């Protein structure tokens, strides 16, 4: 798209959403908004409330309890938005009276979790001809479903954490002894399509299996039972489209039994992030190369965070791929790029540029 008369592109930051990660998304939005270069971009803030309604927000007062991770929330809506698709982008209008607002050139979504990073919003934005920061519909959908992620990666020859997939229809009473016999103990039981460790339980004996499974099924109709891995948690950040770059490696040192939601977002000081991770150069290179291979195999573009286990025996296992990583003050993705020489404002600018490039590529193959 051509720049506007002001010479600036208009970036819409989308945040909130209906998922269990609503509050995490609000926290991410603060950092992204702060980092956007106002000399280059005009800004539209779109908050999505827990009912799925799009609201036009004012940067000065769009959040309540912004300094409290447990109580942060959207301020009451001033007006609800509707979106009208057009040939050269989408037009925002006031849903009540049809009053138009400036059109959007690029969307920067931090709508974490269901509907926000599973391909739903990505599909909407693509239909609306709005470039957006993050993978396309397919890459987003596949990476959101941890079972499908593993299937694609196994086919691509990328080693993944051993697991068993259970469905709520038919597998609500699985053969626990057989699963323990196959995977051993401890086990991690998790919803297939949740993030931020929501609904995840560590199971150390047979007695805890049923409750952990019931919790996971509260959040998804598909559940993964994963082998507990003894080793280190290593993460990498990937950036780019056809020729992605990979950051330095970082390590998570969690004081809890695993890196749970509370540790990540409510008790951030209890989880240590070591960047760069203390790794032999050949291991770090292998991790970064595997991250790149997984990113391309899964059809990712613009950005993703790729998480690994490095076992006590030195084996690398890919744990999961997050196509819309956190941008909070404690989030690993921006910290990894900062350690790689790309500060927060430069990272956000790069993501916006990549979003536009990805949209141009998609338009050429229609």
Curated annotation (Swiss-Prot):
Mg(2+) 2 binds at residues 320, 322. Pathway: Cell wall biogenesis; peptidoglycan biosynthesis. One of its GO terms (molecular function) is D-alanine-D-alanine ligase activity. GO terms for biological process: cell wall organization; peptidoglycan biosynthetic process; regulation of cell shape. One of its GO terms (cellular component) is cytosol. Mg(2+) 1 binds at residues 307, 320. It catalyses: 2 D-alanine + ATP = D-alanyl-D-alanine + ADP + phosphate + H(+). The keyword Magnesium applies. ATP binds at residues 180-235. It holds the Pfam family Dala_Dala_lig_C. Residues 150-353 form the ATP-grasp domain. Keywords: ATP-binding, Cell shape, Cell wall biogenesis/degradation, Cytoplasm, Ligase, Magnesium, Manganese, Metal-binding, Nucleotide-binding, Peptidoglycan synthesis. Its cofactor is Mg(2+); Mn(2+). Its EC number is 6.3.2.4. InterPro entries: ATP-grasp, ATP_grasp_subdomain_1, D-Ala_lig_Van_CS, D_ala_D_ala, Dala_Dala_lig_C, Dala_Dala_lig_N, PreATP-grasp_dom_sf. Binds 2 magnesium or manganese ions per subunit. Cell wall formation. PANTHER family: D-ALANINE--D-ALANINE LIGASE, D-ALANINE--D-ALANINE LIGASE A. NCBIfam families: D_ala_D_alaTIGR, PRK01372.1, PRK01966.1-1, PRK01966.1-4. This is D-alanine--D-alanine ligase. It comes from Sodalis glossinidius (strain morsitans).
């Amino acid at each position: 798209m051509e720049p506007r008369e002001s010479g600036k592109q208009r970036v819409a930051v989308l945040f909130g959403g209906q998922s269990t990660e609503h509050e995490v998304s609000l926290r991410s939005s603060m950092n992204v908004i702060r980092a956007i270069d106002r000399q280059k971009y005009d800004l539209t803030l779109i908050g999505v409330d827990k009912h799925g309604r799009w609201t036009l927000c004012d940067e000065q007062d769009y959040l309540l309890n912004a300094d409290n991770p447990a109580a942060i929330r959207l301020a009451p809506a001033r007006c609800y938005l509707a979106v009208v698709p057009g040939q050269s982008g989408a037009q925002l209008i006031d849903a009540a009276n049809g009053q138009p607002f400036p059109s959007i050139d690029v969307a920067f979504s931090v709508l974490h979790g269901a509907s926000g990073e599973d391909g739903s919003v990505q599909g909407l934005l693509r239909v609306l001809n709005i470039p957006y920061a993050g993978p396309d519909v397919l890459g987003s959908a596949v990476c959101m479903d941890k079972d499908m992620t593993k299937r694609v990666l196994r086919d691509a020859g990328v080693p993944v954490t051993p697991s068993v997939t259970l469905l709520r229809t038919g597998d609500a009473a699985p053969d626990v002894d057989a699963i323990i016999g196959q995977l051993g103990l401890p086990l991690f039981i998790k919803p297939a399509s949740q993030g931020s460790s929501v609904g995840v339980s560590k199971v150390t004996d047979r007695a805890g299996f049923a409750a952990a499974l019931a919790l996971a099924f509260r959040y998804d109709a598909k559940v993964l039972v994963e082998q507990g891995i003894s080793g280190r948690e290593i993460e990498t950040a990937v950036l780019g489209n056809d020729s992605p770059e990979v950051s330095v490696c970082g390590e998570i040192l969690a004081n809890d039994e695993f890196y749970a939601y509370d540790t990540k977002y409510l008790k951030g000081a209890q989880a240590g992030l070591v960047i760069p991770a203390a790794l032999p150069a050949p291991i770090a290179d292998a991790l970064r190369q595997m991250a790149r291979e997984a990113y391309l195999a899964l059809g990712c573009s613009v950005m993703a965070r790729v998480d690994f286990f490095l076992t006590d025996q030195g084996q690398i296992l890919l744990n999961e791929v997050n196509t819309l990583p956190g941008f909070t003050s404690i989030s690993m993705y921006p910290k990894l790029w900062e350690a790689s020489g790309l500060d927060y404002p430069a990272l956000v600018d790069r993501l916006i540029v990549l979003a536009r490039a990805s949209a141009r590529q998609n338009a050429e193959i229609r």
